[in-house]
UniProtKB/Swiss-Prot annotation:
Protein name as annotated: Xanthine phosphoribosyltransferase
Annotated catalysed reactions: XMP + diphosphate = xanthine + 5-phospho-alpha-D-ribose 1-diphosphate
Keyword Cytoplasm listed: yes
Any Gene Ontology biological process: purine ribonucleoside salvage
Residues annotated as binding 5-phospho-alpha-D-ribose 1-diphosphate: A128, N129, G130, Q131, A132
Family, as annotated: Belongs to the purine/pyrimidine phosphoribosyltransferase family. Xpt subfamily.
SUPFAM superfamilies recorded: PRTase-like
Enzyme class: transferase
Chief location: cytoplasm
Pathway annotation: Purine metabolism; XMP biosynthesis via salvage pathway; XMP from xanthine: step 1/1
Length: 197
């Protein structure tokens, strides 16, 4: 997605060989026009999948998930990382290791909002080692719902998360795939098209 790649190049900051800071438009401050375009792109890519619900994780996945849900006409449920006084019982639970924060979080979804009749699109901001996506998949599977695919805003293709998910037969659609963050420079995976002769 060209507009997203341009935003990453212009406003993203490489903090190390494996950390990209995008708090200017995605993780802290949110660019609603960009989020709207991201939502439209996810909806376009998954429009034939009969999505009934979008599942994401708090907090950075919420904006792109809501925009995609608006386009698809479905609801969003986000996995919580912290216990809530209003959500104590009747929860699906999974443990997720955060690459960025270097900690394990227990995530949960209420059983009241997802069931075996749902066809779910999982959306998240980043895909690195795949732990958040695997945790969200576990919650969806516990509910007996089916997974239509996973939409990722930014995939770090140099880490193994995307490979692990795809090897499990999961459809993963990433809007920007980063090949490298070496030397403080963002390099995108080049989508090569085969020429028919």
């Amino acid at each position: 997605m060209k507009v997203l790649q341009e935003k990453i190049l212009n406003e993203g900051k490489v903090l190390s060989g494996d950390v990209l800071k995008v708090d200017a438009f995605l993780n802290h401050q949110i660019d609603p026009v960009l989020m709207q375009e991201i939502g439209k792109e996810f909806a376009k890519r998954f429009k034939e999948e009969n999505i009934t619900k979008i599942v994401t994780i708090e907090s950075s996945g919420i904006a792109p998930a809501v925009m995609a849900a608006l386009e698809l006409g479905v609801k969003v449920i986000f996995a919580r990382k912290r216990k809530s006084l209003t959500l104590q019982d009747n929860m699906y639970v999974a443990n997720v290791y955060s690459f960025t924060k270097q900690e394990t979080n227990e995530i949960s979804l209420s059983r009241n909002h997802i069931d075996e009749n749902d066809r779910v699109l999982i959306i998240d901001d980043f895909l690195a080692n795949g732990q958040a996506a695997l945790g969200l998949m576990s919650l969806v599977e516990q509910a007996g719902a089916s997974i239509a695919g996973i939409g990722i805003v930014i995939e770090k293709a140099f880490q193994d998360g995307g490979k692990k998910l795809r090897e499990q037969g999961v459809r993963v659609e990433s809007l920007a795939e980063i090949a490298s963050l070496d030397n403080g420079t963002v390099t995108f995976v080049q989508q090569e098209t085969a020429e028919v002769k």
